[in-house]
UniProtKB/Swiss-Prot annotation:
The lineage of its organism: Eukaryota, Fungi, Dikarya, Basidiomycota, Ustilaginomycotina. Its EC number is 3.1.-.-. A zinc finger (SLX1-type) spans 361-419. Its main location: nucleus. Catalytic subunit of the SLX1-SLX4 structure-specific endonuclease that resolves DNA secondary structures generated during DNA repair and recombination. Has endonuclease activity towards branched DNA substrates, introducing single-strand cuts in duplex DNA close to junctions with ss-DNA. Residues 13-93 form the GIY-YIG domain. This is Structure-specific endonuclease subunit SLX1. Keywords: DNA damage, DNA recombination, DNA repair, Endonuclease, Hydrolase, Metal-binding, Nuclease, Nucleus, Zinc, Zinc-finger. It comes from Malassezia globosa (strain ATCC MYA-4612 / CBS 7966) (Dandruff-associated fungus).
Amino acid sequence: MRISSVVEHRTPRVYVCYCLRSLSRPNQTYIGSTPDPIRRLRQHNGLVKQGAFYTRMARPWTMDVVVYGFPSKLAALQFEWSWQKPHASRHLRVMHDDGTRPNKSSATAAVYAGRSSKPLFPATRSSAPSSAASHDSGLNLRKKNRRVRMRSSTVPEYKFLVLRALLASEPFCFWHLHVGFYSEYAYGVWQFMDRANPTRYSVSRITRRPLPPSYPPVACDFRGVQGTNTPLAPPQDATAHTLRTSYPVLPEATTLSAAQKKKRSTSASCAPENEHMWAEEIPHARDAETLGLTWEQLEHAPTIARMEVPDGLMQASSAARGRSRRLRSHTSFLEALDQDASALEAHLVHASRKDMSSSICGLCGGHINRHVPLSYTHCPHACDAVFHLTCLARYSLEQETRAHARTFCLPTSAWCPMCQRPPVPWPEIVRRVFRRAELKVSM
């Protein structure tokens, strides 16, 4: 029997929002979410029954990018809806240049992006019911009352703009979400936009709150979500100079982007795809030279970042790994997601054994109730320190206040006052607290 995450919160091991790109219609995409990306892609391509009815006319599909690390399934669905409908999302609204109300400084005022503001990405097209029955009686009356649906562009590069805007906007920028790329083309588009705005993710878009230096974490696996693609490889006799100055031949370079089609089109009614208020532009072509994607950049593309676990802890989690659900994955990218969850359980098993000896908060000195696992947390770097969750949050907020004049309710990172190691994103601390609570219930 499944338990609702609303009644009893649980952090999903793997739940991703994905962007599909049609290979038969290069300018058509589909946004969705799933706990099993491999099976979901097979459903979209008609290889597995059930679901994926909307995408049946544009097969085959390929999965270009995934966003993962959501605190709950409901959070992923919120992100998916905003990615699908940026023109209607309240999180993607036009704000003042400094992110504040008029006549107020950024240190004292925060702005909520309500529906009264203009959308960052206005609707670019509209759809209405078919007029095939134009000769039916009473059609004129029905045409007056029919509803016109506003839609957002489905161009792949446009969806990348929306993704970057969501990752910079509240509350998504504080969830420490990860981005994974499964194609060289998708990684090249991301790099193209990243070079144009290298400080895009230094602060949040609305409250101007500093974000972690490595946000958002990016990883690549060019073998595809199913592990069946062959990554592009440079010539065997390529020199270091050749790798820096030459460009790979992308399969997507043979397709026309929306900008190229606009130049060739003579119709004045064709709506441009770059009519948006987001301060980034779409590349005008899909070849590697336009994207600035060299062989050297492909060789140094980031892979999945593994979680650091102290030596000897993996053996302690063998039983926990046996109880965990394994994804039917053939790629290191998805395997790493589940392996990180197993490593996290190993860390929590090791830390839970110290509960008897460490029952004093390292900050306030008060007693820690071990029977309420959601009230305390261990050091994120596996030292012996234990803290009340509220005490660690208060201490971390004090560290942030030194660099930022404003005070917030929750920190973006957690500092351990004992070991003085680099900070860890606060969502990771919360995720470990809930995972430890689940582990104690199952033990």
